[in-house]
Amino acid sequence: MTHLQAGLSPETLEKARLELNENPDTLHQDIQEVRDMVITRPDIGFLRTDDAFILRFLRARKFHHFEAFRLLAQYFEYRQQNLDMFKSFKATDPGIKQALKDGFPGGLANLDHYGRKILVLFAANWDQSRYTLVDILRAILLSLEAMIEDPELQVNGFVLIIDWSNFTFKQASKLTPNMLRLAIEGLQDSFPARFGGIHFVNQPWYIHALYTVIRPFLKEKTRKRIFLHGNNLNSLHQLIHPEILPSEFGGMLPPYDMGTWARTLLDHEYDDDSEYNVDSYNMPVKDVDKELSPKSMKRSQSVVDPTALKRMDKSEEENMQPLLALD
């Protein structure tokens, strides 16, 4: 075992070996193989390439060197293309702070039987008058940044439960294609986390319809790990034991305290702001809240490519419309 594996239990070390192809004898060589690929993408500002950081991406891609590098590149490219999201990227930012306090996201105290961290979202808690959907996404990404520092979670991963109870049609109408694409690319394509399951509970018909629309844009692996339980909490309990769930999910624990995870981040004053800023990338900043621009989010193109700054055509303008139109 190398110092890079020091935070892992014997059980997790064995899991990393069997499931992720992690080999302590070649660990430094594996990391260097990924680091050597950085020069192939001069259009991206790789702000971190230290051993511990690259190891997260290797674990997320089961030590396939090229796939790990591609994820590393997409991680920084996403931040480079959406710089405004990562300005004031800290728990004390007003929008992030309020989203955290409303439970975006929450984190249960107990791990599941696979050692995974259970994240929870209560969708109806979103107060549109105080913070935006982008703030919610920023709060989730900041939380994941803090959690992924735990090497146990790098190996074991996460599960997510979203409770859609009382989430209104009006709230759902704010979920535009570009907002959803921003979330999908930020979480599915650009972050070194292993998601073992995403569970929808109490979802109304319009959320089911929304999922049908975005499903083709999800990776096959992601689609297989999304479970639509509706009001059937028994099917949820077959996958996540009720002994570790709060009462909102039919569990045996008291109701979830929405501010638990927010207090954790705020008490530690978690701040990732210094990593991703305008000066580091030295590139134009885009106002994500203002435009959620359809000319962004094209993973294969560099933000410094002037051809990206083109006029929207009609099809792109249509993409700015809500998926669920209000009468």
From Swiss-Prot:
SMART domains per the UniProt record, alphabetical: CRAL_TRIO_N, SEC14
Domain CRAL-TRIO: 96-257
Localization, UniProt: Golgi apparatus, trans-Golgi network membrane; Early endosome membrane; Cytoplasmic vesicle, Clathrin-coated vesicle
Chief location bin: Golgi
The keyword Coiled coil is annotated on this UniProt entry: no
Example GO BP: lysosome organization
GO MF annotation list: phosphatidylinositol-3,5-bisphosphate binding
Protein name: Clavesin-2
Gene: Clvs2
